[in-house]
């Protein structure tokens, strides 16, 4: 009985290992130079102190990880769709002015550490001075490209 359970656990572990290997092979990491030029320029313009440590691609998106842990998602054309700086403040150069005015007008004691741009507008994750986080959804469609 114990041998049967151990054999089943071993078989499940082997299956997980094989499936994760296949999954990794389906989306191997790319060199940073294979990001679209627009995405490369975005990183250079807004994160000049950081370097790209990993790039993954699917059929219609790119995920870029920087050396400070920042994760940036781009669409297939190289336009950013998500920037997540974890606990750090995001650079504000690329955030639409009206979004910044709204956020800092309504949440003056917060910093933005994540911004997501979608078809319905923006979602931002804010962090208070005490370290608490909240998410705010804002509809500003004029600045989407």
Spans of features found by a protein language model:
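Bacterial N-terminal signal peptides that target proteins for export
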Residues: 2-11
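Interaction-mediating elements
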Residues: 26-145
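Bacterial Sec-dependent N-terminal signal peptides
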Residues: 3, 21-27
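Bacterial N-terminal signal peptides
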Residues: 10-21
């Amino acid at each position: 009985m114990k041998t049967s359970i151990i054999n089943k656990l071993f078989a499940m572990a082997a299956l997980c290992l094989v499936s994760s290997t296949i999954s990794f092979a389906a989306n191997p990491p790319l060199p940073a130079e294979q990001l679209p030029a627009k995405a490369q320029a975005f990183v250079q313009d807004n994160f000049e102190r950081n370097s790209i440590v990993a790039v993954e691609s699917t059929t219609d998106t790119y995920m870029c990880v920087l050396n400070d842990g920042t994760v940036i998602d781009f669409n297939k054309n190289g336009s950013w769709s998500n920037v997540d700086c974890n606990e750090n403040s995001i650079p504000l150069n690329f955030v639409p002015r009206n979004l910044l005015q709204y956020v800092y007008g309504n949440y003056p004691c917060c910093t933005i550490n994540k911004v997501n741009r979608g078809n319905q507008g923006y979602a931002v994750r804010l962090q208070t001075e005490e370290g608490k986080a909240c998410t705010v959804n804002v509809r500003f469609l004029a600045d989407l490209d």
